[in-house]
A protein has these predicted regions:
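Short amphipathic alpha-helical segments
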Residues: 13-17, 68-72, 108-116
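Short alpha-helix capping/helix-loop boundary micro-motifs
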Residues: 38-44
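Auxiliary tRNA-acceptor-end handling modules of aminoacyl-tRNA synthetases
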Residues: 34, 46-65, 79, 88-96, ...
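Short amphipathic, charge-patterned alpha-helical segments
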Residues: 13-27
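Short, contiguous acidic and Ser/Thr-rich linear segments
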Residues: 4-16
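Active/ligand-binding-proximal structured segments within catalytic/core domains
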Residues: 21-24, 65-83
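Short loop-to-beta-strand transition segments
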Residues: 27-38
Length: 223
């Protein structure tokens, strides 16, 4: 598939992007993690309701790497939930090809990092389905009251959006405002390591998606 090729598509109502462009996605040189439809970024499971311009987004692009990073963060949360279900994780800020995270109620140890990394690799190797479910704010408020869960609550409280996107994988779920990939297997290049009082969730660069770059000390960045 030609890099970043834009296509004008005509489709039947409620056709998923992943179904419409199945061949192009399979033939892509790099894993496809989302799409840009009529200038809006969409999940590959997004159901098209009209014809329009569509561009597949792979991980060899800045926006694709953002989706990669969000998906990896989701998987990291799922791995902690399986290994340390009581851990209160905070994603603090972005460094050079890494997210700096802390745990409010537990000490970060090397043993913990090894265990969580193994859980993450297991989730990635299984290429598990990640499903997006959109709720109204009222439905989301009722959901949080019913489940009494802290997952995604901070971000939820800070947003003013009328619609809330919850992402599910198996029995795990969390809230993300922007696009997350539809499968865990696209995030196969990563590392997690103890750093200061917290830890780093490291990932590749869109400049070279096949290697994990050496970590460099930098000022924190917005993510």
């Amino acid at each position: 598939m030609e890099k970043n090729k834009k296509m004008i598509m005509q489709t039947e109502e409620n056709t998923k992007i992943s179904e419409l462009l199945k061949k192009q996605i399979a033939q892509s040189e790099y894993p496809v993690v989302g799409a840009k439809f009529n200038n809006e970024y969409k999940n590959l499971d997004y159901s098209l309701e009209e014809s329009g311009k569509i561009e597949l987004i792979d991980i060899n692009s800045k926006e694709g790497m953002k989706i990669y990073r969000r998906t990896l963060t989701f998987i990291m949360g799922m791995a902690f939930w399986r290994a340390y279900p009581k851990a209160h994780i905070v994603v603090d800020y972005q460094l050079s090809n890494a997210m700096y995270c802390t745990i409010e109620n537990m000490e970060v140890t090397e043993e913990m990092m090894q265990k969580v990394k193994a859980k993450m690799q297991e989730i990635i190797d299984k290429d598990m389905k990640i499903e997006k479910r959109t709720m109204t704010r009222k439905e989301a408020e009722e959901f949080y009251k019913k489940t009494n869960t802290p997952k995604g609550r901070l971000q939820f409280d800070l947003e003013d959006n009328n619609e809330i996107n919850m992402y599910y994988c198996g029995n795990y779920y969390n809230y993300f405002y922007e696009v997350v990939a539809t499968h865990t297997g696209v995030t196969n290049i990563f590392d997690i390591q103890k750093y200061g009082n917290g830890f780093l969730l490291r990932y590749s660069s869109s400049k070279n998606v096949n290697i994990l770059p050496k970590f460099k000390e930098t000022k924190k960045l917005l993510w």
